[in-house]
Amino acid sequence: MISTVIDQSLGLEFPIFQGGMAWVADASLAAGVSNAGGLGIIAAMNSNGEQLREEIRKCKTMTDKIFGVNIMLMSPFAEEVSDVVVEEGIKVITTGAGNPGKYMAKWLEAGIKVIPVVPSVALARKMEKDGAFAVIAEGGESGGHVGDLTTMALVPQVVDAVKIPVIAAGGIADGRQIAAVFMLGAQGVQVGTRFLVAKECTISQEYKNKILKARDIDTVVTGKRLGHPVRSIRNSFTREYTKAEYDSANVSDEELENMGLGRLRRAVREGDVSQGTVLAGQVASMVKK
């Protein structure tokens, strides 16, 4: 694989990041990816500071390689975890669900490389101005929360708009897709769905089986009505949710939002892949083992 400024700057064997997937990206998966030569990432999610500290320290016992933390900026504990990553000596942070601007000075002073996930050129430019080391341009093919632009359209536009390195995400599962985004100007890739079936991934076997059995047309985007579109694998819940989403006369936004609460944990931890949310990207059908 080609060597780029990403792996060279971070001391990686490969310029491959593991996505900071909520309820999935724990110490076990992060350590596994880092030990294999990529950048493993722990998802802070809605963890408080001490919960994240525990996961970071657990990861340190499992690898002596560099690993990162993904911080969800809309978390009520974002302030706490923003301090914990500094205290624990984390060297790479990826961010999502908000603007990391208020924490940038603190992180940069600590020598942390901040790499925000961006769905648009405008946000990429803003992050460059604020001091980001790189940006992750994530297309709508990805699992979880998605933007409007595809990876093929977004990546070259971001590459042309900023001078910092661009990492491509969304719709990447094998070497052909990695080569393709490098041709678009990316310096690295972030992969999520492909890692869901890894032995180091601690999600339920039912969730893994759902990925392994997925067809090319099996993902769907829900949540557009609330302004938070999410890509997942079709199941009984997505069908019920979609029906409710289009029934605005009888289903309020609040009721719709409540329908989605706890669904990801239900699939990941309890193995309920019928009524839980099985987040996955459009490349799920390419994952066979």
Say what each PLM segment does.
Residues 1-165:
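Active-site entrance/lid segments in N-terminal catalytic domains of soluble metabolic enzymes
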Residues 21, 171-172:
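Active-site metal-binding loops of divalent metal-dependent hydrolases
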Residues 153-167, 173-289:
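Conserved active-site-proximal phosphate/metal-binding subdomains
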